[in-house]
């Protein structure tokens, strides 16, 4: 089974019950066709970068799942005919590095870069500007 991620945006006008029904529908399509859902993340309602189907906001969801490759065509077909999903993106994780990232994302672990503290620097000496002394004579 391959590792996948499905991000989809629902209309912001849906009630909580309708949102739950749409998410359950997508989860059902995945499980009925032989997929295993690892995690579902609700990212909340956010402003869209640009207007999509006359909507400026949308409710974001991400589903991480494992599935046979044949499921992707069926899932795409079902998501496209669902009018309440205004946009979706499906991502396939292939190599070991990507699969490791998929597993971290499923667990909700954010990748952080550990920075080692730098050694303290010696204090700088105050800068003194030398001005050439010029003598002016009156004529």
UniProtKB/Swiss-Prot annotation:
Keyword RNA-binding: yes
Region (Disordered): 114-139
GO MF, any single term: structural constituent of ribosome
Record keyword rRNA-binding present: yes
Comp. bias intervals (Basic and acidic residues): 114-133
Any one annotated GO CC term: cytosolic small ribosomal subunit
Keywords from the named record: Ribonucleoprotein, Ribosomal protein, RNA-binding, rRNA-binding
Gene Ontology terms describing biological process: translation
Disulfide bridges in this chain: none
Entries under Pfam families matching the protein: Ribosomal_S6 (PF01250)
Function: Binds together with bS18 to 16S ribosomal RNA.
NCBIfam families: S6 (TIGR00166)
Family statement: Belongs to the bacterial ribosomal protein bS6 family.
Name listed for the protein in its UniProt record: Small ribosomal subunit protein bS6
Organism field: Campylobacter concisus (strain 13826)
Species classification: Bacteria, Pseudomonadati, Campylobacterota, Epsilonproteobacteria, Campylobacterales
């Amino acid at each position: 089974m391959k590792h996948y991620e499905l991000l989809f945006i629902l209309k912001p006008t849906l009630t909580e019950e309708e949102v739950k029904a749409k998410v359950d529908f997508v989860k059902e399509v995945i499980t009925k066709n032989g997929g295993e859902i690892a995690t579902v993340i609700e990212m909340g309602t956010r402003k869209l970068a640009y207007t999509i189907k006359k909507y400026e906001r949308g409710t974001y969801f991400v589903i991480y799942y494992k599935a046979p490759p044949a499921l992707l065509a069926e899932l795409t077909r079902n998501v496209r005919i669902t009018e309440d999903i205004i946009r979706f993106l499906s991502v396939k994780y292939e190599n070991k590095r990507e699969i490791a990232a998929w597993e971290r994302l499923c667990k909700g672990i954010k990748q952080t870069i550990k920075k080692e503290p730098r050694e303290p620097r010696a204090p700088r000496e105050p800068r003194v500007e030398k001005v050439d002394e010029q003598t002016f004579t009156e004529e």
